[in-house]
């Protein structure tokens, strides 16, 4: 049988020795940077890569980072379930968006200072009072106390159920992913970008190595000036062909495609 270790460094460190599979795979889908992992993961993960027959990751950056420990380290992409994202559906406007002026620049996801650039958002929103900035998701303490809350054109709508977030996205005029660039996000695969694109939405995002995969389908930005320029461009009405291409591109990131790549690297 095959053994697949899904980023489980501690509990699975001796799994190869105990289970004796004919082929072992270590799946690396995140930089393990939290306090729980920080003490031992930098020492153990390279050794786990070395003892595995194959290492796969969901982004080029995460694969490249461990190639010195295992030459058989490859990016297999990220599978995303987009079955509920359908532009033919008529999604009802959420009640807490009814009185928000348009155009709306929106984000869906955890609103955390570990991943999002609050100061960038503040600069952009401050300089663009004609736009509404909507954040859908639970906030950490940093964001709860941030001056963003003092801006009348910034709206924090709180955490929603996953199935509800589609309605919010569908009523954004532009979708955004204003990430910080740090050890967590530099190789992180942004599944929400695929969700945005699956609805045909124009997307602006912070430029990272992984976001290069989306070149030609999103606006990749660095700094407030580029973000503001991208928002202005993204709000210009576009053709149905471009919308269709966004949707089609998002649907290339399927679990089927990811697993097919995985199988192509398994050599038994």
Predicted regions, residues:
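Membrane-proximal helix-turn-helix segments that form the acceptor-binding/catalytic region
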Residues: 36-58
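Nucleotide-sugar-dependent
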Residues: 163, 167, 175-198, 204-216
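A charged, aromatic-enriched C-terminal amphipathic alpha-helix characteristic of glycosyltransferases
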Residues: 239-267
């Amino acid at each position: 049988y095959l053994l697949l270790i899904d980023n489980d460094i501690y509990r699975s460190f001796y799994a190869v020795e105990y289970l004796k599979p004919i082929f072992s795979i270590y799946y690396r889908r995140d930089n393990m940077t939290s306090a729980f992992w920080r003490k031992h993961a930098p020492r153990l993960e390279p050794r786990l890569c070395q003892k595995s027959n194959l290492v796969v990751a969901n982004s080029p950056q995460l694969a490249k980072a461990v190639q010195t420990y295992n030459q058989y380290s490859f990016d297999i992409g990220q599978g995303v379930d987009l079955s509920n994202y359908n532009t033919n559906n008529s999604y009802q406007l959420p009640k807490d968006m009814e009185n928000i002026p348009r155009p709306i620049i929106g984000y869906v996801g955890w609103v955390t200072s570990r991943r999002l650039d609050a100061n960038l958002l503040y600069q952009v929103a401050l300089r663009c009072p004609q736009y509404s900035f909507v954040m859908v998701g639970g906030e950490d303490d940093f964001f709860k106390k941030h001056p963003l809350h003092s801006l009348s054109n910034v709206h924090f709508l709180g955490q929603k159920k996953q199935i509800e977030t589609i309605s919010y996205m569908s009523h954004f005029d532009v979708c955004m992913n204003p990430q910080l660039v740090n050890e967590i996000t530099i190789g992180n695969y942004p599944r929400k970008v695929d969700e945005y694109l699956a609805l045909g939405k124009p997307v602006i995002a912070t430029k990272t190595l992984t976001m290069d995969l989306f070149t030609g389908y999103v606006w990749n930005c660095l700094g407030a000036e580029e973000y503001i320029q991208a928002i202005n461009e993204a709000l210009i009405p576009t053709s149905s062909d471009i919308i269709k291409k966004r949707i089609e591109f998002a649907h290339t990131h399927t679990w089927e495609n990811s697993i097919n790549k995985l199988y192509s690297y398994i050599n038994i």
